[in-house]
Structure formats: C-alpha cells, structure tokens
Amino acid sequence: MRKIDKYRGIVGFLDPEMIILKRINEEADEVEAYIVKALLAQQDKECIFVVCQEGYHWALLVIFPKWNTVYNIDSKGYQSPSCYSIKKLFDEAFGAYVDKKGRHNKNFGRTVIWKHFQAHIQPPGSMLCGQYVMYHMLSFADNLSLDRDRYPQGRAGFATCPLLPDEIANVRERLLDFFMNEVIDIGGSCRVEGASYN
C-alpha cells in the first residue's frame, strides 16, 4: 500500500501555480473559475490545502468546505486575512461553489469564516517560508489523519518558535521521498493521472 493512501479521502489540494499573485492580478476570472471547479471536485475531502504566494512569501491556507472555514497558517506570524490577495477572490468563488450545491455549512450560507492558526515563525531575514509551509502542511495532515476531530475545532496550533535545522531537513527528506516514490515513476514520468482541474 502506498504511503499516500493514509491521506486519500482526507486532504485535497489546489494547484499553487493557479494561486500566485501575478495570476490572481491578471487572470482573476480564470482563477475564480478554477477554485470553484476544484472545490466541487474535492468537496468530499476533510480539508483542502492551498499554498499561496504573496509576492516573495509563501503561506498555507487550509480550507474546510463543510465548515465554511479557511485557516491561514503563516510563518510570518499573524496576518489579517484581508492582506492575502486571494481572500476577496476566494470569498466570491466560495459563493459560486455554494450556489452550485457544493458541500458547506448551511448556517453560514455563502459566508466564509477566516481564522488564524498559530504557526512556527521563521527567523527574520530567512528564506525558508516554503519549508515552513511544507512542515505545517505535513504536520497538519498527519494529525488530521490520526484524529479527524482534533483539528481545527479545538484549541490547536503549532509552537511559535523557529523550526530546528533537523526539522527542516526532515521536511526536505519527506518531500523528496514523496516525489520519488509517489509522483515520479522509474522512467521519470509523472504517475498522477488526471491530477488537473483546468
């Protein structure tokens, strides 16, 4: 059994290439349509990870469609949801998703609740935001796969101290292992069939 199977049915993903600042600014309608289509295709997931790029910084958003909730996990510390370029676009896309009968909390209708999720804070001046995003994503998914009721309803979060070098090395090793064993086959081709929602 492949290692990724423990996450199957639990987590989904939006394509980070579709959520970069440049594309949001230049192709907002296409990005919104992509988000609606991807949410509908993955509405049975417990959560959907969105790695979004804000200028030269990466942050993680975790969408819980059934709760109308988005958690922002940012290694820069607390960031108001309004500072993310995707917020307005995502709110509109979620409304369209609800209109198309996507899974959501009927008590909130089209409203999206944005919440901050405490995260490890990267050292000032470091260029490790991508590794922090991956660490938070892997840790979140690991905990979610073990105890679905623990996140995010309870008081949950990460410590705010910087990651230790061995923790960053572990993230890199896990990612390399994932790509070499789950994504790329022996011939160097991608194993994932039909992975696009475009």
Q: Residues of each region from the PLM?
A:
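Cysteine protease-like catalytic core of ubiquitin/ubiquitin-like
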Residues: 7-198
